[in-house]
């Protein structure tokens, strides 16, 4: 095999970086490209219900595998995916967006083709994507095409941001040297500037040496930029109390003896709030300081000794070191921190009270009770997706087993995201370990936006748990504004009929409305095995919500009403 098509080259390269499932929809400008997927052993085409869901699915897949690929067609297809791509950009998720575009000659002649705006401008959609992409490429020359593909894959992986790659329909069948595949794409980070890195290390070590009450706070980019292992070692060596943000949930093993809980500013438990805000040194790993991640910007550190570790810069107090990457800094810090922290005397960490109060089996389910019980159902290695709304807030009250991976979209907050993301996560989990469970918590309102992807799960024999929280509409919106407004209402669905409607043969669909029904179901040994796709309708009161969401809604309503 001395030569291969450019299309096959793309998929061979993706397989080399462990991307085995491709998401998207066929369209006439990408059909020849899609043919090449089936030429690569071990590669599969998911085939989504729509492009938005495909982008969501790619996001969910990438959070577990490091990167993903979604393929759409020019214009109508790519624009449908952009909300999902924007979410991946905001949340630091590496998704390669490949767009099949018209041939180079059609573009040069400015033909009035379908899927265009009718003005001869073939660059407009590419330009739209450039604002939500780390980099973009429009292939125009077969000779440079392989190196451009390699650059796009590397950038997607390293930056953990979306990258746009346009492939003209007339180029995908042209041949390139197969020998190019023998040189792997370099996915390593470039070394830090030694002088800047040493200055950071020396300053941080001095701060650690002087600290009497330090804490470690892990946020979203701790997971996204692959420093979970370094952060765990930092906790092990120093014994500093460790906390996570809502977006960082799952970044630290919550069974670790030095884990103290979830910090969300004023929405934190009193014990966690006091522990974090009274610290004399905060080591913040991968922070994304958005409103819902910080209790509407209510962080209130008493110290100015704050070290922020980011993927592409470090901030120590008021000094910023651009280009200094946290991966290398943390690795070198681990070799020296033991001596710097030797004077630290460990203090007790907060422990959330476990809700073990007996309740009658006939007690109707309520959010506060459910989220304290979810942790009892979870197992090590689970992937837990929580939808924007009550689920994303309620999960902060759940104690995770070790090695639990949490997926939510706290910053971008696109309603329905987890419907598609669950599909992607289920594909990824199957590739990593077929026994790994994927568990979704989604509201009845959010489900209506992306429900079609359940059919794709069934088609591929995937076996997620789909917990549908039925509170009869958009509770999070009602809490912010319009409690009785018609626009926060939805049509009630027969949720238990969804799986057979989409063609499922081996499935379980069940409704739980009381604590007794919940306990009986979640403790059942057969139910705990991911042997089939399951949909569980959880009946909840209309205005019932986790206490932290009620407080957040009040803060959000207040901010929305401000005049200046």
Curated annotation (Swiss-Prot):
Belongs to the TPP enzyme family. Keywords: Decarboxylase, Lyase, Magnesium, Metal-binding, Thiamine pyrophosphate. PANTHER family: PYRUVATE DECARBOXYLASE, PYRUVATE DECARBOXYLASE ISOZYME 1-RELATED. GO terms for molecular function: magnesium ion binding; pyruvate decarboxylase activity; thiamine pyrophosphate binding. Its EC number is 4.1.1.1. GO terms for cellular component: cytosol; nucleus. The gene is PDC1. The keyword Membrane does not apply. Mg(2+) binds at residues 444, 471, 473. Binds 1 Mg(2+) per subunit. Binds 1 thiamine pyrophosphate per subunit. One of its GO terms (biological process) is aromatic amino acid family catabolic process to alcohol via Ehrlich pathway. The keyword Iron-sulfur does not apply. Homotetramer. This is Pyruvate decarboxylase. Pfam families: TPP_enzyme_C, TPP_enzyme_M, TPP_enzyme_N. Pyruvate binds at residues 28, 115, 477. InterPro entries: DHS-like_NAD/FAD-binding_dom, PDC/IPDC-like, THDP-binding, Thiamin_PyroP_enz_cen_dom, Thiamin_PyroP_enz_TPP-bd_dom, TPP-bd_CS, TPP_enzyme_TPP-bd, TPP_PDC_IPDC. Its cofactor is Mg(2+); thiamine diphosphate. Thiamine diphosphate binds at residues 390, 413-415, 445-446, 471-476. Transmembrane segments: none annotated. It catalyses: a 2-oxocarboxylate + H(+) = an aldehyde + CO2; pyruvate + H(+) = acetaldehyde + CO2. It comes from Kluyveromyces marxianus.
């Amino acid at each position: 095999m001395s030569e291969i098509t450019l299309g096959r080259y793309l998929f061979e390269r993706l397989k080399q970086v462990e991307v085995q499932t491709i998401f998207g929809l066929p369209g006439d400008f990408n059909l020849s490209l899609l043919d090449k997927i089936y030429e690569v052993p071990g590669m599969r085409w998911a085939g989504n219900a729509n492009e938005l869901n495909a982008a969501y699915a790619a996001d969910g897949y990438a959070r577990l595998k490091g990167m993903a690929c979604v393929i759409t067609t020019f214009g109508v297809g790519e624009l449908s995916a952009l909300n999902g791509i924007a979410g991946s950009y905001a949340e630091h998720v590496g998704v390669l967006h490949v767009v099949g575009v018209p041939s180079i000659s059609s573009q040069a002649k400015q033909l009035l083709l379908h899927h265009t705006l009718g003005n001869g401008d073939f660059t407009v959609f590419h330009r739209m994507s450039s604002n939500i992409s780390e980099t973009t490429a429009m292939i125009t020359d077969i000779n440079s095409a392989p190196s451009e593909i390699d650059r796009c894959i590397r950038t997607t992986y390293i930056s953990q941001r979306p990258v746009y790659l346009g492939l003209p329909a007339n180029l995908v069948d042209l041949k390139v040297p197969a020998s190019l595949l023998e040189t792997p794409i370099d996915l390593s980070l470039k070394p830090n500037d030694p002088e800047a890195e040493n200055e950071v290390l020396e300053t941080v070590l001095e701060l650690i040496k002087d600290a009497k009450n330090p804490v470690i706070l892990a946020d979203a980019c701790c997971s996204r930029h692959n420093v979970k292992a370094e952060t765990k070692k930092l906790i092990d060596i120093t014994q500093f109390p460790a906390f996570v943000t809502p977006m960082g949930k799952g970044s630290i093993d919550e069974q670790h003896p030095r884990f103290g809980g979830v910090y969300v500013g004023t929405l934190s438990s009193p014990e966690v709030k006091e522990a974090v805000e009274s610290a004399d040194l905060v080591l913040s790993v991968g922070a994304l300081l958005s409103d819902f991640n910080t209790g509407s910007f209510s962080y209130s550190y008493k110290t100015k000794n704050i070290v922020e570790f980011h993927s592409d810069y470090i901030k120590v107090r008021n000094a910023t070191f651009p280009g200094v990457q946290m991966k290398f800094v943390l690795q070198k810090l681990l070799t020296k921190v033991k001596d710097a922290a030797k004077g630290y005397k460990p203090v007790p960490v907060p422990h959330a009270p476990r809700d073990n109060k007996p309740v009658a089996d006939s007690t109707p389910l309520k959010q506060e009770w459910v989220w304290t019980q979810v942790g009892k159902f979870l197992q090590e290695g689970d992937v837990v997706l929580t939808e924007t709304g009550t689920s994303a807030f309620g999960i902060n009250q759940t104690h995770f087993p070790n090695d639990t991976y949490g997926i939510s979209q706290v910053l971008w907050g696109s309603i329905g995201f987890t419907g598609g993301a669950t599909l992607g996560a289920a594909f990824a989990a199957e590739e990593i370990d077929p026994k790994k469970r994927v568990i979704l918590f989604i509201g009845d309102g959010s489900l209506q936006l992306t429900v079609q992807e359940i059919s794709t799960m069934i088609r591929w024999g995937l076996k997620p748990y789909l917990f549908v929280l039925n509170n009869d509409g958009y509770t999070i919106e009602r809490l912010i504004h319009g409690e009785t407004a018609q626009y926060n209402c939805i049509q009630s669905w027969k949720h238990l009929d969804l799986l057979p409607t989409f063609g499922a043969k081996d499935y379980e669909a069940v409704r739980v409305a009381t604590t007794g029904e919940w306990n009986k179901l979640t403790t059942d040994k057969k139910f705990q095995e991911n042997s089939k796709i399951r949909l569980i309708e959880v009946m909840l009161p209309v205005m019932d919500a986790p206490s932290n969401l009620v407080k957040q809604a009040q803060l959000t309503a207040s901010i929305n009403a401000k005049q200046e």
